[in-house]
Amino acid sequence: MVSVINTVDTSHEDMIHDAQMDYYGTRLATCSSDRSVKIFDVRNGGQILVADLRGHEGPVWQVAWAHPMYGNILASCSYDRKVIIWKEENGTWEKTHEHTGHDSSVNSVCWAPHDYGLILACGSSDGAISLLTYTGLGQWEVKKINNAHTIGCNAVSWAPAVVPGSLIDQPSGQKPNYIKKFASGGCDNLIKLWKEEEDGQWKEEQKLEAHSDWVRDVAWAPSIGLPTSTIASCSQDGRVFVWTCDDASGNTWSPKLLHKFNDVVWHVSWSITANILAVSGGDNKVTLWKESVDGQWVCISDVNKGQGPVSTSVTEGQQNDQ
């Protein structure tokens, strides 16, 4: 069972598209169709507006916090085809970089695991995915995967830096042999997995097919040291799938239908321990799902968005009536 512990009045003048807590859970970033990005201090249940960032010329779809080892850095992407990277310096938030390399709306931004350095993946409606790597002295290197998804890319999500199974297989004191990977979802109804080659170029490693409409979001689950990789995906078709891969080569992925909703599903997000999946969609609910001992996914709680402190525990029998 979950309950609403805090409600933030953002004072956005239009629809809010994304809200993300920072690493420490003390700051909340929001973005809206009013073209603004706002940052709030939400410690102790409060809400203090820290920054109102203006720089986009269209609806802002998504925000993403970088790991705090690089400072207070936030990325935002917009319908205006731009990605803006904001940084706090001496208590003031300022635009530190603007990426204008896409020909259409940029729909998703996601920072790579901090082990790799400061790397940002950006998915766009022009079908391309760009990867921005900070090289120092305010400079960013750009690599682009053209035609990553026909019609457009809606979501990007990095694989964890910890190699699956490394906590039990890795020799003591030896640095893991990281292989950079990320997943993307697009308007071609596909999830694609991408891998960085030895020459630094990105190659499509796998196509995952199960959805019958646009893939709206993908989320690669955090690694907890087990020799398994897990990805959640959701779609315009109302379905949420959980994909698992148990082989070391990463070539065999098996989908399991978590649930078929009666409306579009916009977002999926894993808990830090990768055992609970949050799902939100057009039914105006956020539902939490957990895998039972028999391998079935069970809805353990739901919260009606915009309805205040509603808390409901949903049994496996009830979920089938939703």
UniProtKB/Swiss-Prot annotation:
Family annotation (PROSITE patterns): WD_REPEATS_2, WD_REPEATS_REGION
Leader sequence residues: none
GO biological process: cellular response to nutrient levels; COPII-coated vesicle budding; mRNA transport; positive regulation of TOR signaling; positive regulation of TORC1 signaling; protein exit from endoplasmic reticulum; protein import into nucleus; protein localization to plasma membrane
Keywords: Acetylation, Cytoplasmic vesicle, Endoplasmic reticulum, ER-Golgi transport, Lysosome, Membrane, mRNA transport, Nuclear pore complex, Nucleus, Phosphoprotein, Protein transport, Repeat, Translocation, Transport, WD repeat
TM spans (from-to): none
Topology with respect to the bilayer: Peripheral membrane protein
WD-type repeats, residues: 11-50, 55-96, 101-144, 148-204, 210-253, 260-299
Activity regulation statement: The GATOR2 complex is negatively regulated by the upstream amino acid sensors CASTOR1 and SESN2, which sequester the GATOR2 complex in absence of amino acids. In the presence of abundant amino acids, GATOR2 is released from CASTOR1 and SESN2 and activated.
GO MF annotation terms: structural molecule activity
Subcellular location: Cytoplasmic vesicle, COPII-coated vesicle membrane; Endoplasmic reticulum membrane; Nucleus, Nuclear pore complex; Lysosome membrane
GO cellular component: COPII vesicle coat; endoplasmic reticulum membrane; GATOR2 complex; lysosomal membrane; nuclear pore outer ring
Function summary: Functions as a component of the nuclear pore complex (NPC) and the COPII coat. At the endoplasmic reticulum, SEC13 is involved in the biogenesis of COPII-coated vesicles. Required for the exit of adipsin (CFD/ADN), an adipocyte-secreted protein from the endoplasmic reticulum.
UniProt protein name: Protein SEC13 homolog
Species of the source: Bos taurus
Organismal lineage: Eukaryota, Metazoa, Chordata, Craniata, Vertebrata
